Amino acid sequence: MAGRLIFHCDGNNFFASCECIEHPEWRDVPMAVAGDPKDRCGIVVAKNELAKKAGVKTTDTIWQARQKCPNILFVPPHHDEYARVSRRMNAIFREYTDFVEPASIDESYLDMTGAPGFYGLSPRELADLLRERVREEIGITISVGVSFCKVFAKMGSDYRKPDATTLIFRENYQEMLYPLPVATMLYAGRASVQTMARHGIRTIGELAARSRADLRRMLGKSGEQLWLYANGLDDSPVRRYEDKPEVKSVSRGMTFRRDLVNMEEVRCGVSVLVDEIAATLRQSGLKGSVISVTLKAPTLHTLSHQVTLPHPTYLQQEIRTVTMQLITDHWSVSAKSPVRSITVGVSHLSGENEAYTEQLSLFDLCTSVGNAEKEPTVGLEKQEKVEAAVAKLRQRLGNDAVSLGCYDNDEIGVRRYGKKR
């Protein structure tokens, strides 16, 4: 058991469990958290154990879930509450180690190396203590995987649920994991599993037994990585809680309550998405130089385009103008050619203080992107002052206090930044 001691703590049925904190009576009935069918996102995003036993699965539509479990209770998601519970969970973990790395809202890695000796507890006792504290102080359960690397710790928390501790060490990992289907190997996607099956690899043990070169020939770099993980060769560190992961892009998307049939409706949706993106970039001290947009039709046909700007930006109006130009250039929105959903992204990020050699006006920028009808433009310096002032007002009064070119449209399901959808 020499070396590192890594925990992976995973909230069980997290969204559903959070809802049951305020409504403990829901624990005794089949319950699922699901989107609003009116917004065309009526799918199950989490379910409790009773719904799970009835066969309800995450991503089931509401109709499918009700077919499997006629008496199921559906509740809408409350993401602010889930974030609050997540912070409380991590606060408990941070009492035992500075190395707490949230992997998502409901799971975190902990580097507990040295903790057993310090606290006078075995690894299992420490994991059980964390489970007990989360259960008693917050009101939800977690499963904890304990291992010498992050990959096996994660597989440990998946191994036995709910409210369980699983230890996977060098002495027992082959016995525990190698008989499992290769599809249960962390990061083994469906296509990779199918490729490995064609080469006679159906268990994790068979994956580990093949040569590293074989896996690279089969699957490229991802195959080599899977081979390393299957053999317990994962030395990726656990970050400190304060160390933020590198942000590579910021994007927002939305499926609208009904199809968008004109450019004014598209502009309304784009404005709200871009407002959130620009606020996130500014709060993170980042700018981006590549703007992308993805449109999806009711037929689920998808169209994506992007453009590289002559300089990085986090200005809402600039991002919106370029996004609208991309849409105008590539999609004639109408009742015959409607839009079901839009996703806007900004990537190739850099620090906000990074200098660039040329400041073009928005008019020049539009000219470089295309020649279709342009939105009203404002000089970059003036627009920067406007958006900086808006950011300060939002900080004081709330995100929904001021909007920039955005408005609510209940018919298509759009709410301004900061207002609950």
Which ranges hold each PLM region?
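Gly/Gly-Pro- and Ser/Thr-rich, intrinsically disordered tail segments characteristic of DNA damage-repair
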Residues: 1-228, 238-241, 279, 369-421
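Short, charged/polar surface micro-motifs in flexible loops or helix N-caps
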Residues: 12-14, 37-40, 298-301, 349-352
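Residue-level signal for secondary-structure boundary sites
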Residues: 41, 118, 152, 301, ...
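Short, histidine-centered active-site or binding-site loop motifs used for metal coordination
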Residues: 112-114, 254, 308, 366
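A glycine-rich phosphate-binding loop feature that marks nucleotide/adenosyl-phosphate handling sites
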Residues: 148-151, 232, 287-298, 339-350, ...
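DNA-contacting surface of Y-family translesion DNA polymerases
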Residues: 184, 192-338, 356
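C-terminal hydrophobic structural anchor segments
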Residues: 313-314, 318-325, 329-392
